[in-house]
């Protein structure tokens, strides 16, 4: 979970996303925006049910908390499947999954993550992330000549959560190892890209490699020290 604030302009930051992140971060940004809606406007509902295994001989208690928004109805969807046990015998299992009828967006996830907290801290933060999400969707379409399925949530996200605080853009959350952090959040994320993402970072045309990235990766005399172990 992260928000790659590679520039203070969210659309420029989106253009700086490498191909892997253009594909991956669309869903992550949608999850963060969805979590903002559910944590601020949703009503916590606890669903409890039993999964049934071993032809009815074993019952496993399950519990899930959802945050339905107005217009959504929580329910448990059950599915019966036939499986083969270790001895080769067939048996039925009944598995329940907590879901929402009339779902408007993704479920709440990682709500205590620094980026999730930042996204719902002020309406300015929320709308900045909406623009980053929109920018990455545009990058995806530009680079791969097709639309991402998550684009269906674009219109929903245009309206901020009803209960979000009004306020200015706050400093970006820095979800990265301390070795990349400096006083400037954007430079911190650029450090993170150069030091941790260079091994897989590429940009499919018509996108271009950011100059700050290519210059620093190619400059052997850079003051920035890359870590000895590259993190995935």
Annotated model-derived regions:
Residues 1-43, 47-112, 116-232:
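Sequence termini and other peripheral, non-core segments
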